[in-house]
Amino acid sequence: FSAHRTPHKVEEYGRHAQSRGLKVIIAAAGGAAALPGALAAWTELPVIGIPLPSSELKGIDALYAIAQMPPGVPVACVAVGSWGARNAAYLAASIIALSHDGIAASYRAFRDNQRQG
């Protein structure tokens, strides 16, 4: 959904994310990229923002919008596009792994496998 076109949906999603059992929110957005920051305003959960290359600026506008959040409304920002999407998933897994042994073991195995080449 769009933070600009459907702000009521953003509020609803953010306010109730934790009670629905979510541990981390991943939000992708292009252009003005308000979605990650708007969600962060409505939840205490970690929010990871993925800037998308949706305009002539190839995602630089979205990168700045997500990375330049004001103090007190943090959003973790990953790379633009598909690499960012992958890293957002890995970052979310590492956060959830702090309190979930099964995910911790799987994530550790994934990282060990990466190091092996």
Predicted segments — roles?
Residues 13-55:
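Glycine-rich phosphate-binding loop
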Residues 5, 33-34, 83:
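Short alpha-helical
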Residues 8-13, 36-39, 60-62, 87-88:
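Short, well-ordered secondary-structure micro-motifs
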Residues 58-117:
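C-terminal binding/interaction regions
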Residues 1-7:
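Short beta->alpha junction loops
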Residues 2, 52, 80:
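Cofactor-binding loop segments of dinucleotide-utilizing enzymes, especially the Rossmann-like FAD-
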